[in-house]
């Protein structure tokens, strides 16, 4: 769920967010 929060924070972290989301 943290990934979602990061995504809203910024879109430059979208790459990292997607990777984290898959793991979660």
Curated annotation (Swiss-Prot):
UniProtKB keywords: Antioxidant, Copper, Cytoplasm, Metal-binding, Oxidoreductase, Zinc
GO cellular component: cytoplasm
Cofactor: binding details: Binds 1 copper ion per subunit. Binds 1 zinc ion per subunit.
Primary location class: cytoplasm
GO terms of molecular function: metal ion binding; superoxide dismutase activity
Subunit structure, as described in the record: Homodimer.
Cleaved signal peptide residues: none
Lineage: Eukaryota, Metazoa, Chordata, Craniata, Vertebrata
Cellular compartment(s): Cytoplasm
Biological role: Destroys radicals which are normally produced within the cells and which are toxic to biological systems.
Superkingdom of source: Eukaryota
Keyword Chaperone annotated: no
Protein name: Superoxide dismutase [Cu-Zn]
Swiss-Prot/TrEMBL cofactor(s): Cu cation; Zn(2+)
Catalytic activity of the protein: 2 superoxide + 2 H(+) = H2O2 + O2
Family: Belongs to the Cu-Zn superoxide dismutase family.
Keyword Membrane: no
EC identifiers of the protein: 1.15.1.1
